[in-house]
Amino acid sequence: MATPHINAEMGDFADVVLMPGDPLRAKHIAETFLEDVREVNNVRGMLGFTGTYKGRKISVMGHGMGIPSCSIYTKELITDFGVKKIIRVGSCGAVREDVKLRDVVIGMGACTDSKVNRLRFKDHDFAAIADFGMVRNAVDAAKALGVDARVGNIFSADLFYTPDPSMFDVMEKYGILGVEMEAAGIYGVAAEFGAKALTICTVSDHIRTHEQTTAAERQTTFNDMIKIALESVLLGDKE
C-alpha cells in the first residue's frame, strides 16, 4: 500500500534495495545495470525502479540528502514494502592521507554528530554498524572484481558546510575513512526495524588536499561501486 512518500504497492520492491542519494543516479543505475526495469516510485521526484540483475530481482531508489530524508525512505521501505536489505551507494570525502581519490570505502561502522540514534536509544550511544554478512560479501565481491576496497569507520555529518573544520583532525586521529551524511541514520533505522544495511562509498573529493574527481572519474569509480554492491547481493543469496 502506498505511503505518503512512496506510491508503490506491496511486491513492487525487491527484498534488496540499492539507494544512492540522487534519484537521477538511481535512474542511471537501473538503466545501466538492470534488465526488465520498471518505475515503481516518483513521489516528490524520488525515483525508484525495480528490475533484474543476472536474473535476480533488485530495486534501486534515491534517498535524498541527510539523515532525516534517508530515514523516512528506508523506514517505509522496510515496514511497508517488505524490504530486508538496504545498500547505500554514494560518495564521501576523505580526511586521511592514505585514503585517495576514487578509493572504494565499505562503511563497517558509522560515527555521527546527529542525535537521531540517541533519540532511538534512550539518549545512550548506539553502535551504528553494518550487517557483518553484507560487509563480508561486499569485500569478497570487490576482491573478485579486482577492486582494493577500504573497510572501516565512516562519519555521517549533519552539516555539509561545517562551522568547525577542526573536527576533521579528530576524525583523522580516530581513523575515519570518509565523511558522508546518511550511513549512521540508515544503520539505526535498520536496527530499529529488524532489517540489514550496508554503505559503500567512493571517495569523490579529499577534504584536506581539496582534490576533486572529474565527472568522468566519478562515473568510472561509481560503476565499480555499483558492481560490488550488485555482486554482493548474489553472494548473499548463496549463504
Curated annotation (Swiss-Prot):
Binding-site list for a purine D-ribonucleoside: H5, E180, M181, E182, S204, D205
Any one Gene Ontology BP term: purine nucleoside catabolic process
Superkingdom per UniProt: Bacteria
InterPro entries xrefs: DeoD-type, Nucleoside_phosphorylase_CS, Nucleoside_phosphorylase_d, Nucleoside_phosphorylase_sf
UniProt entry tagged with the keyword Transferase: yes
Active site (catalytic residues): D205
Enzyme class: transferase
Site label Important for catalytic activity, positions: R218
Transferase keyword on record: yes
Catalytic reaction(s) noted: a purine D-ribonucleoside + phosphate = a purine nucleobase + alpha-D-ribose 1-phosphate; a purine 2'-deoxy-D-ribonucleoside + phosphate = a purine nucleobase + 2-deoxy-alpha-D-ribose 1-phosphate
GO cellular component, one term: cytosol
Residues noted as binding phosphate in the record, renumbered to the chain: G21, R25, R44, R88, V89, G90, S91
GO molecular function, one term: purine-nucleoside phosphorylase activity
Listed SUPFAM superfamilies: Purine and uridine phosphorylases (SSF53167)
Record function comment: Catalyzes the reversible phosphorolytic breakdown of the N-glycosidic bond in the beta-(deoxy)ribonucleoside molecules, with the formation of the corresponding free purine bases and pentose-1-phosphate.
Subunit record text: Homohexamer; trimer of homodimers.
PANTHER family: PURINE NUCLEOSIDE PHOSPHORYLASE DEOD-TYPE, URIDINE PHOSPHORYLASE
Family from the record: Belongs to the PNP/UDP phosphorylase family.
Annotated protein name in UniProt: Purine nucleoside phosphorylase DeoD-type
Organism: Klebsiella pneumoniae (strain 342)
